[in-house]
Each structure stands twice: as C-alpha cells, then as structure tokens.
Amino acid sequence: MTAVVLDGVATASAVKSELAVRIRALREQGLVPGLGTLLVGDDPGSRAYVAGKHRDCAEVGIESIRVDLPADATEADVRLAIERLNSDPAVTGYIVQLPLPAGIDENAMLELIDPSKDADGLHPTNLGRLVLGVQGELTSPLPCTPAGIVEMLQRYEVPIAGQHVVVVGRGLTVGRPLGLLLTRKGLDATVTLTHSRTRDLEQEVRRADIVVAAVGVAHLIKPEWVKPGAAVLDVGITRVVDPETGKARLTGDVDPAVAEVAGHLSPNPRGVGPMTRAMLLANVVQAAERDARLAAELRG
C-alpha cells in the first residue's frame, strides 16, 4: 500500500481561488478586507513567516497592513500598536507574530486583541465560543491549523464522523482546539488527546483511524505504530542536522516509511502548513463578510 498524498499546496491553492471570488464580491460592495500583522524584533523565521502571509494576501486581493516594532520595544509599545490595530477600520483581522521579546507578557498582549479581529482564532473569547458551540454554524474565527486539517480531510473525502482520531500533542495552537473542533456535532469524531505523559503511546496511535502528530519530535510516529489504511497528518516540525551534509533541515513528526502503511498521508512540508495559511485568509474573509452583513442591516 502507498498512501494517497494529502497535498496541502494544491488544496490551499483551491481554497485561495474560492476566497478570491468572495473577495471580489466584497470589493464590488465597497468593502476591502485587510490583514494586519504585528511583528516585534528581527527574528529571521518570524520575518519570513509574516512576509509569506502578505504574499498570500496579494494573491487573493486582501490588503496588507504591516506594523513592525524594533526588538527593544517595550510592553507599552506593543500595547499601543495593538490598540491602533483594534481601532483601524482598514484592518479586518490581524495577528501578533510570536514569540514576543523576553519581558513582554504574551498572554496579556494577545488578550488585548479585539476578538472580532482575531485572525488566528486563538483569543480566549473565540476559543470559549468553540467550547460552548457544540452545534450549528460558528461565526467566530477558528484556530487556523485545526481548521486547515479538517478542511483538507473533507476535501479528500476522508471520513471523520464516527472515526477514532488520536492527536499527539496538546498545544494551544493544534492539539487542544483540534479536539474541540472534531467533536462538534456535524463532525462527530471520537478524539483521544495524547501527550508526553501518555502511557503506551504506540498502542494509542495504533487504534486510530486518523492520526494527527503535532508534538515536534522528529519521526516519532513509526510505520509499525499505524493501523493499515489510517489517515496520518504530520504537523510537528523539528530542526535536525543532516548527517550526510552537516546542514540543518526541517523534518516532521512522522517517519517517511509510514507512507507504505497509511491510507492517506499529509507530507511535511507541503501538507498542513499551507492549509494553516489559507485558513488565516479564510478567517479574514469571513470577518469581512460579517461586517458587510452588519452594514447592510444598518442601512435597512
């Protein structure tokens, strides 16, 4: 058996094409969606990540609002920048790029974000709505990586309802919110959330119809851990040194040999990562459409 590849690049491209149509409709109404980013410092990885987001915006027709602060910015500086993004009518949604410099309370800064402009879907208010809203349409933004995982599974027609999903990793950006999303009525998966203290992790993974590896341990998930035909999504990233070249490279949580056992496999890179970026754009478009509906209601 060779796994069907869950191609995140192709799937994200399809999502962005659909978003571009919706954005054109918004622009025809005089509403221009805008994504803001707040970057503090000169971390090369963060700069590259933010630049990628703005390239995505240009591709689909979303305006970019970029706020960069120096590495020696104070918490007061960051607070002021967030307040300005909250009040800027050109900003439909925005993100605060993490990590922030030492000495700045990240949680306190993130809680300052206007929940209606939370493009990452990770504000406590929006996560709380995900907890409470077990059925019906969610109008608040969803965490981007979990939403991207679900979108990709659905587009490849991988069954979710009634399936046993094992999530390896309990982080705020993937593991915990993914469990909440997959157990909503309408998706109806049964989710086991595992972590570093889970007893017999191998046995838990082997029971899964769908495995999501998001722990950041290189090649943790071995082929003998995976039930034949299971869908496996590789989310975690680890920087390792290539023994042949001596150069650092990025690798995922899933051993490449899993492709010979799994029914579906998302590669890493080119798997879930592009879908995360596409869902960020989707959150901005959804917020713009919400604003358009509110404006129409006010006009009567």
Curated annotation (Swiss-Prot):
Coiled coil (residue ranges): none
Annotated Gene Ontology cellular component terms: cytosol
InterPro entries: Aminoacid_DH-like_N_sf (IPR046346), NAD(P)-bd_dom_sf (IPR036291), THF_DH/CycHdrlase (IPR000672), THF_DH/CycHdrlase_cat_dom (IPR020630), THF_DH/CycHdrlase_NAD-bd_dom (IPR020631)
GO biological process: L-histidine biosynthetic process; methionine biosynthetic process; purine nucleotide biosynthetic process; tetrahydrofolate interconversion
Keywords, in A-Z order: Amino-acid biosynthesis, Histidine biosynthesis, Hydrolase, Methionine biosynthesis, Multifunctional enzyme, NADP, One-carbon metabolism, Oxidoreductase, Purine biosynthesis
Alphabetical list of Pfam families matching this protein: THF_DHG_CYH, THF_DHG_CYH_C
SUPFAM superfamilies: Aminoacid dehydrogenase-like, N-terminal domain, NAD(P)-binding Rossmann-fold domains
Binding site for NADP(+): 169-171, 196, 237
NCBIfam families according to UniProt: PRK14193.1 (NF010789)
Family the entry assigns: Belongs to the tetrahydrofolate dehydrogenase/cyclohydrolase family.
PANTHER family hit by this protein: C-1-TETRAHYDROFOLATE SYNTHASE, CYTOPLASMIC, C-1-TETRAHYDROFOLATE SYNTHASE, CYTOPLASMIC-RELATED
The protein's name in its UniProt record: Bifunctional protein FolD
The organism of origin for this protein: Clavibacter michiganensis subsp. michiganensis (strain NCPPB 382)
